[in-house]
Amino acid sequence: MSKRTFQPNNRRRARTHGFRLRMRTRAGRAILSARRRKGRSELSA
């Protein structure tokens, strides 16, 4: 039986997919603006 690969961890989640990380790069800011344009209630982790 193989182990489950998803081990939830909020700090790691925020550090890899968080808002601050998205704001750091131009591409990240593009992602946020696209999500704003689409009308997402949550922009990032």
UniProtKB/Swiss-Prot annotation:
Indicate whether Ribosomal protein appears among the record's keywords. Answer: yes
GO MF, one annotated term: structural constituent of ribosome
State the GO CC annotations.
Answer: ribonucleoprotein complex; ribosome
One GO BP annotation of this record: translation
- Report the Pfam families cross-referenced here: Ribosomal_L34
Q: Is Ribosomal protein a UniProt keyword of this protein?
A: yes
Keywords annotated in UniProt? Ribonucleoprotein, Ribosomal protein
InterPro entries, alphabetically? Ribosomal_bL34, Ribosomal_bL34_CS
Q: Which domain of life is it from?
A: Bacteria
Can you tell me which family this protein belongs to?
A: Belongs to the bacterial ribosomal protein bL34 family.
**What NCBIfam families has UniProt attached to this entry?**
rpmH_bact (TIGR01030)
UniProt name for this protein = Large ribosomal subunit protein bL34
